[in-house]
């Protein structure tokens, strides 16, 4: 399980950086953008989206060094010249016997310094999931805490592409704390005010991919999903889905989920989104054979190939109450009706 998670972590980080660099490249800069070095107010009725990916190292108060496996990816709305809101996925590296990651909702204050430099201070609630051991038994611990950061941006491309240095501090309730220094890239995008999903159409998608229980020595399985999604304006959507997680002898769940989605269009054809909601499932490997209520957390990148068809990549995390958390990396194809 540890090797698989390392491969997944590298894939997520590498693909995030490569994709962000591609989308923010000179060939994608709009001709009508302002020449000013720092972001300015968006055009009326047009959202401005910020995306970033950072990587680095740090230490935890339990387990020590993160072994250069800490990283964070996030995206959100730029509200004005100074304030933004974000959703982020944070992986706190690999301290000894701890593999903690999770999702944070952040408020951010940005202060321009000079022509190309800006200081940024962010903080918000952080829901974490830690794969560890308690009394020599595998445990998936869930805790709430606060993720706070101070960062410096240097804009390489005016009003667009920037380099970022970020210091993170995680303060947990009843768990260990951590500090990390991260380096990476980011970009501001003029979000399309009318993304494809905002036209009121129902989107039906099918998904397939890998499914891995967050325990040592558990084989990887195939997972599948069928989903129906509807928009709520330009920034939100809701969905209902049937989820099959495979059966590896430890977890064999299937069930139905409902999620609320935050949707951020970064190009006329590209959209980032994150969803969360309840997931009711039955586990064939559970002796009680009873229904259980879990949480399904998702992050997704979508390309609108045509007006009717979209292709997507998605990461699902099934957060359980019985130490059988599951990671699903999936590709999907959806059609608008």
Where in this protein do the model-derived segments appear?
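Bacterial N-terminal signal peptides that target proteins for export
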Residues: 2-16
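Bacterial N-terminal signal peptides
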Residues: 14-24
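Short glycine/proline- and aromatic-enriched beta-strand/turn motifs that initiate or cap beta-hairpins
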Residues: 27-91, 180-232, 236, 328-336
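Transmembrane beta-strands of outer-membrane beta-barrel pores
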Residues: 53-61, 69, 89-95, 125-133, ...
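Residues that define the transmembrane beta-barrel architecture of outer-membrane proteins
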Residues: 65-71, 99-103, 142-148, 177-181, ...
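Residue-level signature of outer-membrane beta-barrel architecture
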Residues: 77, 109-111, 154-156, 187-189, ...
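Repeated loop/turn-to-beta-strand initiation elements of outer-membrane beta-barrel proteins
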Residues: 81-87, 115-119, 156-165, 191-197, ...
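Outer membrane beta-barrel transmembrane domains
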Residues: 126-142, 147, 151, 269-304
């Amino acid at each position: 399980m540890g090797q698989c998670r390392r491969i997944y972590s590298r894939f997520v980080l590498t693909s995030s950086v490569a994709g962000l660099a591609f989308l923010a490249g000179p060939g994608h800069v709009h001709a009508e953008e302002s020449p000013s070095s720092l972001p300015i107010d968006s055009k009326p009725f047009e959202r401005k989206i910020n995306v970033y990916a950072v990587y680095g190292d740090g230490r935890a108060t339990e387990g020590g060094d993160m072994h250069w496996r800490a990283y964070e990816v996030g995206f959100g709305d730029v509200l004005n010249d100074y304030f933004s809101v974000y959703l982020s996925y944070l992986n706190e590296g690999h301290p000894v016997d701890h593999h903690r990651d999770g999702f944070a909702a952040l408020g951010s204050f940005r202060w321009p310094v000079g022509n190309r430099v800006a200081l940024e201070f962010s903080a918000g609630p952080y829901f974490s999931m830690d794969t560890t051991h308690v009394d020599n038994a595998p445990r998936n611990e869930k805790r709430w805490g606060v993720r706070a950061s101070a960062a410096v941006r240097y804009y390489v491309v005016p009003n667009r592409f920037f380099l970022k240095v970020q210091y993170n501090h995680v303060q947990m309730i009843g768990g260990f704390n951590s500090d990390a220094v991260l380096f990476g890239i980011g970009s501001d995008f003029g979000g399309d005010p009318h993304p494809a999903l905002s036209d009121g159409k129902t989107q039906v998608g099918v998904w397939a991919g890998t499914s891995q229980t967050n325990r040592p020595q558990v084989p990887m399985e195939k997972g599948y999903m069928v989903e129906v999604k509807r928009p709520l304006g330009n920034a939100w959507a809701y969905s209902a889905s049937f989820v099959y997680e495979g059966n590896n002898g430890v977890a064999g769940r299937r069930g139905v989920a409902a999620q609320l989605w935050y949707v951020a269009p970064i190009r006329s054809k590209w959209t980032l989104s994150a969803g969360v909601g309840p997931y009711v499932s039955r586990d064939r490997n559970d002796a009680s054979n009873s229904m259980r209520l879990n949480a399904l957390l998702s992050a997704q990148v979508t390309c609108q190939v045509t007006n009717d068809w979209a292709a997507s990549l998605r990461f699902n995390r099934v957060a359980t109450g019985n130490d059988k958390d599951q990671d699903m990396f999936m590709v999907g194809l959806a059609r608008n009706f």
